[in-house]
Every structure is written in structure tokens, then in C-alpha cells.
Amino acid sequence: MSWQQYVDQHLVATQCVTMAAICGLDGSIWAKSNGLELSQDEVATLARSFSKDEVLAANGIRIGGTKYIYLSGDDKLIRGKKDRQGVHIVKTKTAMVMALYAEPILPEQCAVVVEKLGDWLIQNDL
């Protein structure tokens, strides 16, 4: 299965995610939804930001030029929100699974889908 199929079939097709991407920890973009604008700089910055609450709280989370307010996170997760939209990011051994959602999707719905894929990737050393 290609990375694009994971984005399309395991994230967006659930209807719990509006747009998604799977990116390398080096900032490379492996697959993304149509219409999701990402830069390698944004992705690389996010990859370095796990467990850096102070930096994320001060600077927010930037995806596609949009700044999301940092809500919470740890060494594996980053969560953010802007108005009626949000972002949920899971870090694996080699990648980040990034999902955006918008109302009426609830943050918890997006989180379950993204974390399920992230956990599967971790279990398979990806």
C-alpha cells in the first residue's frame, strides 16, 4: 500500500479527518490530501517540536501558512486548534501522521483515527 493510500483510505475516507498528510521526520512530504499546502520547512519544524511545549505555546503550530493554537502534546502527539478547525499529529519512528479536521467533526473523532494509524505504524517499526 502506498503512503497516498494510507492518507486517502485510512484517514480522509473515515470522514473524521478533513485533510491529512504523512511526512518524514526530515521534513519530506510522503503523501498528502489534494488542496493541503505544506512546506518542508513547516514539516521539519513540527518534527523538531515534539515535547517542546514552551516553543509550541509561544509560536503555535503552522500548517499550510495557517497558525493553530497549541493545545497539548508530548513526545508522540501534538494537538492544536483555530476557530472551528483543529490539527492532530502523531509521531512514529520515521514519520508524522498529520490530520486536520473542521466542525462538525469532533477533536476526539479525529484523534481516534490518527492515533490508530500511528500506533499501527509504530508496531510495524515505521
From Swiss-Prot:
GO terms for cellular component: cell cortex; cytoskeleton. Pfam families: Profilin. The keyword 4Fe-4S does not apply. Keywords: Actin-binding, Cytoplasm, Cytoskeleton. It is found in: Cytoplasm, Cytoskeleton. The keyword Transcription does not apply. One of its GO terms (molecular function) is actin monomer binding. CDD domains: PROF. The lineage of its organism: Eukaryota, Metazoa, Chordata, Cephalochordata, Leptocardii. Belongs to the profilin family. GO terms for biological process: regulation of cellular component organization. Occurs in many kinds of cells as a complex with monomeric actin in a 1:1 ratio. Binds to actin and affects the structure of the cytoskeleton. At high concentrations, profilin prevents the polymerization of actin, whereas it enhances it at low concentrations. By binding to PIP2, it inhibits the formation of IP3 and DG. This is Profilin. SUPFAM superfamilies: Profilin (actin-binding protein).
